[in-house]
């Protein structure tokens, strides 16, 4: 396959630059870090909820229930503080998603997705 000169030059220029100095790479790394932090926070939140649920589920009467809640005030405070924070967070909008000019890397993302059945299914489900 013969690569057009413009595409060849763009790819050659991209390959010469240090990846860690590329602005698009830096933006994607920053977004990755943000999403990993969010995943860790949510996993911790779910773990705390499950822990409290199991403790409450093992109570046999009202007094035990009240005792479990009293013993776990810090956990309850943490759960409701985090839950309130999650409710205040706005869900991802298009402004939050880094916009990369994929054409400068000679990649037509729509064609790439259309050629891959798994990616196309994810795209149609709204997950891409």
From Swiss-Prot:
Disulfide bonds: none annotated. It comes from the Eukaryota. GO terms for biological process: positive regulation of transcription by RNA polymerase II; regulation of transcription by RNA polymerase II. It is found in: Cytoplasm; Nucleus. Keywords: Cytoplasm, Nucleus. One of its GO terms (cellular component) is nucleus. Present with 981 molecules/cell in log phase SD medium. This is ADA histone acetyltransferase complex component 2. It comes from Saccharomyces cerevisiae (strain ATCC 204508 / S288c). The gene is AHC2.
């Amino acid at each position: 396959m013969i690569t057009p000169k413009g595409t060849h030059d763009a790819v050659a220029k991209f390959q010469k630059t240090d990846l860690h100095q590329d602005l698009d790479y830096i933006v994607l790394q920053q977004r990755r870090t943000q999403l990993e932090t969010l995943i860790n926070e949510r996993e911790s939140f779910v773990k705390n909820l499950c822990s409290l649920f199991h403790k409450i589920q093992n109570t046999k009467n009202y007094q035990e229930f009240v005792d479990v809640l009293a013993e776990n005030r810090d956990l309850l405070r943490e759960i409701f503080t985090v839950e309130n924070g999650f409710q205040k967070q706005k869900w991802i909008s298009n402004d939050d998603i880094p916009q990369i000019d994929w054409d400068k890397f000679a990649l037509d993302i729509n064609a790439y997705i259309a050629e891959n059945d798994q990616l196309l299914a994810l795209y149609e489900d709204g997950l891409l």
